[in-house]
């Protein structure tokens, strides 16, 4: 039977019963308390949306994108492969952000050495109840189509992280729906972030973009592509991303709070970093971090700045596109209480 989720960006989104088991699991429900845009809500007050809605939205878009590309392209799959590939993509999309730390990318400065949020995602997919639910979905495909159509946590992670051998593998085609200049992750977050930030910069014609997707055959293997009639909407999509980075993601006040947040985390986290154990890691979400920030307001300036929304004055700001050799795409200095920081 399945279920439906009413999404503010895409309308009703359908999920199967087994997919709903993943959504209702504790690791996935944690994403309700992980903001998509970190401290951005202190600048654009509507930006309270979370990784939960984004993950479901990406699953919805990757389904539509795959259907459209295959329908428009000249590369065909068997019915069994078509169903298998689509289910693989839906699971990759649904689980791709499970490893995000509280306040998303703003936390990455305090990850254990050598680890990224993708590493925690892989641990969660393989080592928690998520693995059990994925294997249950795989079992239905084995029963219906045979053992070559099994779906495992390892396969989900390998496709998403590009570890499968063979550059011309059909799995490379699948990966491009989630990691390319035309991926469904970007398609969703641009629209979702624009909506909740109350800006228009990230808007583009999603229907035209999806309907323009096709398959290009290169050396006998499928590649995700845009049809000749979709050139303009693809340009619109690229520009939408550019303007969102300039106007929202690199907003100087938002970047200030990212810096404060990184400093605060080093104070409130045990040993100044998130735990490596996946179960301990999953105990951390935005709510717990906010509680810890409030508990340290009186003994840490960075914590106080976030909780009380104290913003330093901007002393100088570089151009958006720095010359070669600059450390980051956006530099600015902060001035407060006669102290100058760079």
Locate the predicted segments by residue.
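Short Lys/Arg-enriched alpha/beta "domain-start" segment
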Residues: 326-342
């Amino acid at each position: 039977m399945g279920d439906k989720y009413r999404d503010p960006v895409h309308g009703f989104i359908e999920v199967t019963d087994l997919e709903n088991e993943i959504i209702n699991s504790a690791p996935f429900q944690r994403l309700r308390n992980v903001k998509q845009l970190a401290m951005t809500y202190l600048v654009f007050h509507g930006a309270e949306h979370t990784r939960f809605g984004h993950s479901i939205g990406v699953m919805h878009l990757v389904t539509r994108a795959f259907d459209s590309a295959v329908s428009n392209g000249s590369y065909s799959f068997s019915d069994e492969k078509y169903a298998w590939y689509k289910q693989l993509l839906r699971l990759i999309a649904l689980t791709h952000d499970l490893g995000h730390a509280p306040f998303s990318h703003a936390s990455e400065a305090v990850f254990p050495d050598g680890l990224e949020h993708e590493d925690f995602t892989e641990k969660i997919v393989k080592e928690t109840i998520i693995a059990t639910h994925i294997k249950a979905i795989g079992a239905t495909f084995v029963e219906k189509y045979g053992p070559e159509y099994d779906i495992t946590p390892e396969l989900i992670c390998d496709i998403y992280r590009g570890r499968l051998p063979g550059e011309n593998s059909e799995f490379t085609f699948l990966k491009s729906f989630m990691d390319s200049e035309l991926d469904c992750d970007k398609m969703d977050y641009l629209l979702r972030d624009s909506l909740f930030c109350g800006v228009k910069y990230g808007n583009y014609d999603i229907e035209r973009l999806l309907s323009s997707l096709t398959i290009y055959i290169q050396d006998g293997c499928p590649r995700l592509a845009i049809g000749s009639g979709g050139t303009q909407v693809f340009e619109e999509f690229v520009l939408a991303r550019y303007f969102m980075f300039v106007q929202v993601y690199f907003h100087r006040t938002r970047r200030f709070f990212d810096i404060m947040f990184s400093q605060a985390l080093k104070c409130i986290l045990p040993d100044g970093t998130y735990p490596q154990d996946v179960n301990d890691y999953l105990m951390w979400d935005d709510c717990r971090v906010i509680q810890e920030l409030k508990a340290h307001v009186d003994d840490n300036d960075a914590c106080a700045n976030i909780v009380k929304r104290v913003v330093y004055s901007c002393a100088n700001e570089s151009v958006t596109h720095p010359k070669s050799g600059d450390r980051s795409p956006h530099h600015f200095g902060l001035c407060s209480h006669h102290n100058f920081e760079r």
